[in-house]
Amino acid sequence: MVGAGINSRDFKERVPALVDAGVDVLVVDSSDGFSEWQYETIRWIKETYNEEVKVGGGNVVDKEGFLYLVKAGADFVKVGIGGGSICITREQKGIGRGQATALIEVCQARQEYFEQTGIYIPICSDGGLVHDYHMTLALAMGADFLMMGRYFARFDESPSKKLAIGN
């Protein structure tokens, strides 16, 4: 399986190239996924490629955001705004929510949606996962999979050479 992150600006050029190269999964990577841009991007991908490629949307922090992305056609939804180690969305836009609260609400919305439609939408917990037990907590709260940057960034092991910048 091959995945790629895209944005909501040049997707009409990038997505065809990625699909032609063999990508299986796309995610519209945005700090605030509850937007018309993301909705239009997901709709275009689903209308153009249908089930040929899976597409995820996010990030959202509540039921309304989850349902908005699902209505657009998202195959999975990323949850979390402001909890990531390099995220500045809370400071820049004044939005965000505690990761546990956001994850619980979105997973409850997902369960309600599943009970109404029979369609299960996987949830990715993205942000704020620092320690080992945070992974267990996120999965116990309903996440199907996790996105982690800070956790792995602290290790010396890497598939590439270490690059020292500055002092």
Feature names for model-found ranges:
Residues 1-126, 130-166:
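Alpha/beta enzyme core
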